């Protein structure tokens, strides 16, 4: 028993059948406009909150006393996924069931089932790659032609790799030899030209090799035109830029070329003079 502010004592605990009958008969006769006055008028030593919960959850007409069916479970699971733990709103879609009853049934039965379904959905969301791979294997089993073509293609690729491996090794060895060989110094065109033609003064046209300016190509080209060998000018310039020749090769090669050119001119002059003094011309 608990005392109120007016000194009255209120009962707590289980409701007796006599108390249930008093509350039911009073509410059916007079209604429940104000729950604080209901226990006083009904002659009950209970507070208004206890009377309200007893009426809503146990005594009001239309309540279902049997167990919750499978259809009701599906309804609870469906609306719980969208509404969450709002039991009073879920109870509106289940006539005859109270929010307290739905909440108790959820925590005692449906929560475990819901957790299992969530774990299965997570497993299904992770498993599609394996299912796709299994489908590919199944397609390969159903279509043996694709398997044969795949094997032939892989065999061809293996042969190509084997045939290309010696060339790759030789290329690797050549590159290693080239990297280990001493690097040929790069020649500037002014250095080569001064060494090839020492009688010509190019000091006014060229500066230091590290800070060299562009040579006067027109004068150099005109010198080669006098020799009648413009192609040799372009060929020497290309070989110098590519650094494929050493200094000795370029210098001696150009000197030999120059000597051959002079010898050829002297020979042609001799031939022309011999023809001029031939007996046929004198007579």
UniProtKB/Swiss-Prot annotation:
Protein name: Transcription factor LAF1
Tissue-wise expression: Expressed at very low level. Expressed in cauline leaves.
Reported induction: By hormones or elicitors treatment. By exposure to abiotic stress.
Post-translational modification: Ubiquitinated by COP1. Ubiquitination takes place in darkness and leads to its subsequent degradation, thereby preventing to activate photomorphogenesis signals. Ubiquitination is stimulated by SPA1.
DNA-binding region, residue intervals: 35-59, 87-110
GO terms assigned for molecular function: DNA binding; DNA-binding transcription factor activity
Disruption phenotype: Partially blind to far-red (FR). Impaired inhibition of hypocotyl elongation and cotyledons expansion under continuous FR light conditions.
